Amino acid sequence: MIDEKQLISHLYQNRENGQWMIQTNDEHQKGVADMAASFAGQFGLPSWGRALGLLHDKGKERAAFQQYIRKMNGLPTSDKKRYDDHTHAFVGGILAKEFMGKDVSHLLVNQIISHHTGLHNFGDVENILKERLLSEEINEGDISINKPLLFQEFIDSPFSKSKVEWEHFHHLSRMLFSCLVDADRLDTERFMDVESWRKRGNSATLADLLPQLEAYMQKLQSNAADTKVNRIRQQVKEQCSRTSSSEKGFYSLTVPTGGGKTLSSLLWAMKHAVSHSMNRIIIAIPYTSIIVQTAGLLKEIFGEENVLEHHSNFDPNDIKDEENREKAKLATENWDYPIIVTTNVQLFESMFSNKTSDCRKLHNMANSILVLDEVQMLPTGFLQPIVDALKAYQEMFGISVLFTTASQPVLSGLIEGTNPKADFKGIEHIKEIIPEEFALHDQLRRVKLAIDDTGRTYDEIAAKVSEYNKVLCIVNTRKDAKELYDRLPNDGVKLHLSRMMCPAHLHETIGKIKTLLKDESQPIVRVIATQLVEAGVDIDFPVVFRQEAGLDSVLQAAGRCNREGRSAMGHTFVFSLAAEKRNPFGSMADSNNARLNLPEDSDWFAPSTMKAYFCQLYSRKQTFDEKDIKHWLYKPTELCFETASKEFHLIDDTSINVIINWENSMELIEQLKESGCTYSLVKQLAKFTVGIRSYDFKQLKGYGLVEEILEGIYVLADRSQYNKATGLSLDNHWLEEVLMI
């Protein structure tokens, strides 16, 4: 018989013997407090984590909640009173405000009342509390709290004796929220779902994994030919190894394409982490197309049990080993893995989110290394809040940041924009790992760059491209890709790449290109692509064409040319389309104009030229905070977490996903119709999904070409509108792609 005075937090009935298994509220709160204290201890605030844990579920001790949890689970109760409200989170918020004082309640109250709903705007917190009858709610039932203990916990906190920059205050609030949310979910899982709890953790440490990386790189070196390129790669590797024990902070690794940046940056990160006892490495990449390549390499080195992919196109069901598959599914919730590979979108939108599911992982970023690959792809419209966030995480949470690229943007110092509000305030000090005297841009110069600003027709460009047998042509829009692809002759293999192809076909085509380029029996391979291939995709053509764009894009395109130095010099041609055609617009026009404003005799590959280019580009910007995140978050008394979360989106989130009814997806679509929407089905179908602009979607829907099989889930009804080689179209008019970063 269960004691009716027992204060229950969670319960379930054992299926084998029918016995009721109960976790008391005291047990749960202490479990959460211990875990949250451990998490917050990573950045020096264990007492704050403990206070959050001890207070967060005090409202479960209300008679209303105790009656509710018993009735919901079929447990008898003698309490026949009718209660209008059985919610519980607000009580802990009231206690935090009552017992901890005005100065700190802003930090704790919101986290506690929001641990199931997501962080509220500051003004809404007061309104939520005012709606409650404070004294009646607190005194109802047996709600007890050790007030002296909590005060002592707070007094002992180092934060009470330190200062936080006001503009960083929201990051501290969100980080403490993360500690509470993850601790709450984990302690609940430990009681309610022991099987899942046991699958978590138990991954290797970075110290365990470092020898595997060193052995892999040594094997590569031993099997590599004695070429100039390979000698430079070894030089870069050794420099990364030498500098890895430097103090925590901001670092950049600027290495021309083909210089071994991926592995050398990983070596630096792992050795830096081991020397500072850091927890994990988080690698953020702009394109999902690059992630598959990078994650594949890391899994080859460390095993899939130590590398977590977390992005929209990854389906954990693709992991063959059941134990690793289940671990990966669980780890996407909180990033408790040694190595995480994710997108800029997943990373930065989580850092500015108010949602429990997004924020839960954030505390595991503390005392970690963040590698931002292809950093020049960070959107300038969000650059100021992103840089401010990185500074906050470095100063308060002990991370190190490594910026890697062949085209390093200017992220330090002050750059004046078109008006005072457009000034960009960068990071005070970023240390470059590769010294200037290495002159890598000269040593790795394997490409001649020719720029022709004369407006050319599609026919002229197609004819020029067709003069070469193995050639890549990168253009700015889907329209341009269509026009040029159609004009190429069919005398060999011609391929197309854009995001109007579903991820399954896109990755299949990239793999096919890599295979064909190694096949000497296939003399003609011509590829027309949008800019998705120009950063990080490991392909190597002797000749590359690039439609006019910013200097960073031009050099990234040149990085797909003669990467391995197989010929003395590769050739990259920059071309312009005739005025009536599709020339750069919007931000692409800003980038192109910044390049055009540089001296014609510039050394396009020199780091000094790249710096001048970015200064030109930034000086043209109206703002580096286009959604005014500073307004919503930089004043502690006006923290608008929910509003900022809705505003901070790096890509156009008005796009609509359409599932392509094609081959393997057909069976999955039928399952979706029969069984409804499940996490597993959504992840599997993501590989056969294309995101399109709302305008184009309206056209498809207007013609009856898409079918809504479930609310908000659309399938292409007319398969003739999709071509595996070229993607989704509307009556042969190719739609524009949505840029995915």
Provide a role label for each language-model segment.
Residues 2-215:
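Accessory nucleic-acid engagement/destabilization modules that flank
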Residues 10-16, 309-322, 476-479, 494-514, ...:
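Conserved helicase motor
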Residues 247-269:
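Walker A/P-loop
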Residues 278-302, 311-314, 410:
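Conserved Walker A/P-loop ATP-binding site and its immediately adjacent core
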Residues 303-352:
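Inter-Walker segment of RecA-like/P-loop motor cores
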Residues 344-347, 358-396:
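SF2 helicase catalytic motif II
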Residues 394, 459-468, 474, 479, ...:
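C-terminal helicase lobe and adjacent C-terminal extensions/tails of nucleic-acid helicase motors
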Residues 407-466:
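Interdomain hinge/linker at the junction between the two RecA-like core domains of SF2 helicases
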